[in-house]
UniProtKB/Swiss-Prot annotation:
Lineage of origin: Bacteria, Bacillati, Bacillota, Bacilli, Lactobacillales
Function recorded in the entry: Catalyzes the ATP-dependent transfer of a sulfur to tRNA to produce 4-thiouridine in position 8 of tRNAs, which functions as a near-UV photosensor. Also catalyzes the transfer of sulfur to the sulfur carrier protein ThiS, forming ThiS-thiocarboxylate. This is a step in the synthesis of thiazole, in the thiamine biosynthesis pathway. The sulfur is donated as persulfide by IscS.
Protein name, as recorded: Probable tRNA sulfurtransferase
UniProt organism field: Streptococcus pyogenes serotype M5 (strain Manfredo)
EC numbers, comma separated: 2.8.1.4
Catalyzed chemical reaction(s): [ThiI sulfur-carrier protein]-S-sulfanyl-L-cysteine + a uridine in tRNA + 2 reduced [2Fe-2S]-[ferredoxin] + ATP + H(+) = [ThiI sulfur-carrier protein]-L-cysteine + a 4-thiouridine in tRNA + 2 oxidized [2Fe-2S]-[ferredoxin] + AMP + diphosphate; [ThiS sulfur-carrier protein]-C-terminal Gly-Gly-AMP + S-sulfanyl-L-cysteinyl-[cysteine desulfurase] + AH2 = [ThiS sulfur-carrier protein]-C-terminal-Gly-aminoethanethioate + L-cysteinyl-[cysteine desulfurase] + A + AMP + 2 H(+)
């Protein structure tokens, strides 16, 4: 027997009361985005489950993709069949025969939500357990902690059989907590910050600053690859490339070296906030970790934050670098992040950046710039690209590798 579908159990959505169906519909849409590389698949949701019908698609890559989607508490590959006792008996016998090995223990766990069905849960447990013993007389039944728990659900539309329960990513469906702008440099920290923001349901749009010719096309591709990795957790992400060369050259030519980083970050914050307002975002997200580098002392954060009243979310602010690296490795962004391409934060980095910059000094140095004009030109020059999941590209690359 081949699996018919993947049954997805919802996570925190069960606590959302009147908004529950809005959350479930958003999860359904996110699942459809993530599974877009599998064109035969169809997705249907109800209040308790989301059903991913395989329609002949190999279930394993689908499970691997679904495991990463935020809002999924657990999932099970299932066999779907008509609500017929003879069909159930045959299916249970076939499944247990395929799983059997010496010493295997099992139990049947039936749940009947269709109370019009001819047998109740207790009767089904007894009948189906007996059917297993008919074909496997040496198998052992065990009610506590068996090797296999064969779950049978009798629902209004069909019967479902499963024996695996795979842990999902948990969290909230991406997009149910509003929209935020993720400042993504290409380093280790900001993709992890984006991942954690996605987990709490934030729909992120990535803002990346590019300063050609000082930053290379490789640096831009790296940032887009990191964004593509993040699409696995909730679907497509808008990638916003910001032209930043003019501003960085102005700062380099007109500001004291010790304040280069502070002024650069203040301009980045202004521009990100202007893009947020233009695109109806609610917050800014970044990868700052307290005390990690010169621009991430409290004094620096205060001087940089002063350009906006928009809330700034810093998901990794209290994490050690090793903790951030471990999470980056777990979400598969680390190897991309350490590719040796310079970003806007490193190309003009001073040898001795100011670790306790004074807000008054920063504002005094900025009097040398046409702030509004520089910000306006940067915002008007943005390039927006929709980044989609990478599964199709990976499959094509694997096919090419196999042919070669």
């Amino acid at each position: 027997m081949d699996y018919s579908e993947i049954m997805v159990r919802h996570g925190e959505l069960s606590t959302k009361g009147k908004n529950r169906m809005r959350f479930i519909n958003k999860l359904k849409n996110n699942i459809q985005d993530v599974l877009a590389p599998f064109p035969a698949i169809t997705v249907r949701s109800d209040r308790d489950r989301t059903h991913v019908s395989l329609n002949g698609t190999d279930y394993q890559p689908v499970v691997e993709a679904l495991k990463l989607v935020f809002g999924v508490q657990a999932l099970s590959p299932v066999y779907k069949l008509e609500k017929s006792v003879p069909l159930l008996v045959t299916a249970v016998q076939d499944i247990m025969t395929s799983l059997y090995r010496d010493g295997l223990t099992f139990k049947i766990a039936t749940k009947r939500s269709d109370h019009a069905f001819e047998l109740d849960s207790r009767e089904l447990n007894s009948l189906l357990g007996g059917a297993v013993f008919e074909v496997l007389p040496n198998i052992q039944a065990q009610m506590k902690h068996p090797d296999v728990t064969l779950k049978v659900e009798i629902r209004d539309e069909a019967a479902y059989i499963s024996y695996e329960e795979i842990k999902g990513a948990g969290g909230l469906p991406v997009g149910t907590s509003g929209k935020g702008m993720l400042m993504l440099s290409g380093g280790i920290d900001s993709p992890v910050a984006g991942y954690l923001a996605l987990k709490r349901g934030l729909d992120i749009e990535v803002v990346h600053f590019a300063s050609p010719p000082y930053t290379s096309p490789g640096a831009l591709a790296k940032a887009q690859d990191l964004t593509r990795r993040l699409t696995r957790f909730g679907g497509n992400i808008q990638f916003i490339e910001v032209p930043f060369t003019e501003i960085q050259e102005e700062i380099k030519n007109k500001a004291p070296e010790a304040y280069l980083m502070t002024l650069t970050r203040r301009f980045m914050m202004r521009i990100t906030d202007a893009i947020r307002e233009q695109r109806k975002g609610l917050v800014i997200v970044n990868g700052e970790s307290l005390g990690q580098v010169a621009s991430q002392t409290l004094e620096s954060m205060q001087a940089i934050n002063a350009v906006t009243s928009t809330p700034i979310i810093r998901p990794v602010v209290t994490m050690d670098k090793l903790e951030i690296i471990e999470m980056a490795q777990a979400i598969d962004t680390f190897d991309i992040s350490i590719q040796p391409f310079e970003d806007c934060c490193t190309i003009f980095a001073p040898d001795r950046p100011k670790t306790n910059p004074k807000l008054g000094n920063a504002e005094k140095y900025e009097e040398r710039f046409d702030i509004d004009g520089l910000v306006q030109r940067a915002v008007s020059g943005i390039v927006v690209t929709e980044i989609t999941p990478e599964i199709v590209n990976d499959e094509v690359e694997n096919l090419i590798d196999a042919l070669l």
